[in-house]
Amino acid sequence: MIIFPAIDIKDGVCVRLMQGDPDRVTVYGKDPVSVAKRWEGEGAGWLHVVDLDGAFLRRPANRQVVASIVKAVSIPVQVGGGIRNLEAIRDYLDSGVERAIIGTAALRQPEILEQACGLYRSRIALGIDARDGLVAIEGWKETSGTDAVALAKRFEKLDLAAIIYTDIHRDGMQSGVNIEATKRLLESCSIPVIASGGVHTLQDIEDLLPLVPLGLLGVITGKAIYSGTLRFKDALARVREKCGGATPSPNPRRGE
């Protein structure tokens, strides 16, 4: 199981929001590049970067910051936020980003996700952000009538690297991961899942470990590692202890 440190960028700095609300923001670092290097130094194998301005503006808004992060670290970076067309996907992947995350566009224009998966095999992730089980879009400002599991199953045959599943009610709240909803998604779909939202302590990491055999690829942690309720090194050590130090395949489809 991979532990992804989250770097959320707003107005060029590293922040965390509560439940995606731009009015409930805490700044955790004025230099996202330094933050990225910190997590790499602590042993991170991946970075999860979100362009929050991009999510709200519907277009990438912090490309230069992301490019600087990619150049500064030697570990792979996945990026989401405001990626609505093939041009944005190409620009990110050509700049050295390993994986682009498509959320809103997957629901609004599914052909973009389909084309991207054909062009960039296993370098595309589907971002599913759910509020009470329903997919939220446009920077979480709108809640659709589409069930999260139904959306995942719709794209099951595509060459997706992963689904990044976020429980909006828990994001930034440090109230524990929604194990039940994550398990439901894993049991319904063969695409690997990265869980997000609600990590608070080491216990939350341990609670996710039984889901690894079901296809859980990793977990994203943000506020917990910035506020200090979870030490990143402790989380890594616990996963290595329980999983035997094995590194999962970047695209481990069940049944393949």
UniProtKB/Swiss-Prot annotation:
EC number(s) on file: 5.3.1.16
Disulfide bonding pattern of the chain: none
Protein name: 1-(5-phosphoribosyl)-5-[(5-phosphoribosylamino)methylideneamino] imidazole-4-carboxamide isomerase
Family, per entry: Belongs to the HisA/HisF family.
Keyword tRNA-binding: no
Active site residues of this protein: D8, D129
Primary residence: cytoplasm
InterPro entries for the chain: Aldolase_TIM (IPR013785), His_biosynth (IPR006062), HisA_bact_arch (IPR006063), Isoase_HisA-like (IPR044524), Isoase_HisA-like_bact (IPR023016), RibuloseP-bd_barrel (IPR011060)
Reaction equations catalysed: 1-(5-phospho-beta-D-ribosyl)-5-[(5-phospho-beta-D-ribosylamino)methylideneamino]imidazole-4-carboxamide = 5-[(5-phospho-1-deoxy-D-ribulos-1-ylimino)methylamino]-1-(5-phospho-beta-D-ribosyl)imidazole-4-carboxamide
Catalytic EC class: isomerase
Superkingdom of source: Bacteria
Presence of keyword Cytoplasm: yes
HAMAP family, alphabetized: HisA (MF_01014)
Pathways per UniProt: Amino-acid biosynthesis; L-histidine biosynthesis; L-histidine from 5-phospho-alpha-D-ribose 1-diphosphate: step 4/9
One Gene Ontology cellular component: cytoplasm
NCBIfam families: 1-(5-phosphoribosyl)-5-[(5-phosphoribosylamino)methylideneamino]imidazole-4-carboxamide isomerase, PRK13585.1
GO biological process entries: L-histidine biosynthetic process; L-tryptophan biosynthetic process
Pfam families linked: His_biosynth
GO molecular function: 1-(5-phosphoribosyl)-5-[(5-phosphoribosylamino)methylideneamino]imidazole-4-carboxamide isomerase activity
Localisation per UniProt entry: Cytoplasm
